[in-house]
């Protein structure tokens, strides 16, 4: 199919992460559709034709290979200890001959346009248990097409008194 010169887009209908690195390298695009339901065909046609600009983000992580599993975005790296405990690296393994980063990480997603973030304001750098923090950010569509952006913010407990088991 690729030899025809036409763009090849993978529509991945799945309910879980899969190891799809070889397939994505051979394709020009990838759209994870999940299980779209009875109107999924029309919705996908709108996205593929450019009539609708996708703005979703992954709620899971797609591993690069089976050797990276399990990959959890919110668990301590007990099975893959960091060489430098102060490192912000998410994943580390001394046994894989492959990059430590997954193929597609939790929260990734693309759009037909571009956005810039500016003027980030956080009400507090430290948050006590049960307290609230207010965050403001200016989001600007810098592309040539209309679109929506999913703004994501993650907090990390650097020094937790208790951690959840994996």
Enumerate the language-model features and the residues they cover.
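Secreted, periplasmic, or luminal enzymes acting at the cell surface/secretory milieu
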Residues: 13-148, 152-156, 164
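A short helix->loop->beta-strand "cap" motif at the edges of active sites that frequently abuts
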Residues: 3-8, 27
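Catalytic core of soluble alpha/beta enzymes
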Residues: 2-3, 21
């Amino acid at each position: 199919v690729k030899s025809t010169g036409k763009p090849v887009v993978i529509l991945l209908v799945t309910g879980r992460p899969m190891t799809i690195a070889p397939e994505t390298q051979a394709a020009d695009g990838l759209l994870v559709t999940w299980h779209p339901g009875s109107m999924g065909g029309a919705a996908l046609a709108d996205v593929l034709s450019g009539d609708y600009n996708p703005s979703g983000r992954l709620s899971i992580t797609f591993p690069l290979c089976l050797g990276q599993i399990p990959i959890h975005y919110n668990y301590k790296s007990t099975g893959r200890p960091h060489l430098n405990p102060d490192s912000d690296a998410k994943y580390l393994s001394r046994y894989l001959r492959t990059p430590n980063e997954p193929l597609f990480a939790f929260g990734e997603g693309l759009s037909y346009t571009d956005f810039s973030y500016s003027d980030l304001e956080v009400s507090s750098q430290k948050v006590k248990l049960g307290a609230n923090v207010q965050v403001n950010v200016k989001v600007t569509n810098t592309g040539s097409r209309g679109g929506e952006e999913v703004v994501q913010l993650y907090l990390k407990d650097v020094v937790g008194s208790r951690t959840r088991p994996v």
